[in-house]
Amino acid sequence: AGLSAESGLETFRDADGLWAKYDPMDVCNYQNWEKNFDLVHHFYNERRKELAKVQPNAMHNYLAQFERETKGKVEVIHLTQNVDDLLERAGATNIIHLHGKLTELVCPKCGNIETIGYIAFDKSPCHKCGNTKVKPQIIFFYEQAPEYEKLHRIFGELEKEDCVLVVGTSGRVVNISSIIAFVENFGIEIGLKILNNLEPSESIDESLFDKIFYAKASEAIPNIDKELKAFWRL
């Protein structure tokens, strides 16, 4: 979530983040979300309201621009844990949302997904099957995350011509260190690994990265851009 922090969105796991104000087991728990139906939807209605007020920041714009400018030379894949749409609004296209999208609703019964945008959910039933318990299209705790399969497949196919850029993560949910260590233990050589966080995280093994920039994402852009262009000789 650190990627979107500079846009003004609250993160979940920082000391003053959303989980310091709300119990995640009340608003992000697959085992009891129907029981807490009203509270859950109130929480995500508020998140959409906040999302409507912010704009992509410099790093969103840089990543989207890099994707556009290197099209045909570099395949850029944005694997994001963020549930906002700021990468999309910046113009990025090849995006995989590992934990769902705040601007969508899903029917657990029939699987129908509808775009709600930034408006509040009015508790209307599923327009396809009539189910009255429509859920935010967010991966809750204790819920399967189907996009993780793509994450592991992509990392399993990396080669020495590829680069991994990690921006704004604590490493506590998707343990990027474990993923990198796992694939490298199987003989996969990743050409360049860059980490950009505000500060070190006990869940991230710095020794796995070639370049580390502890700074705001927007401030790290010049260094990241230099490393990427040198690596791919752009």
Please report, for each region that a protein language model flagged, where it lies by residue.
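Conserved catalytic core of sirtuin-type NAD+-dependent deacylases
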Residues: A1-L234
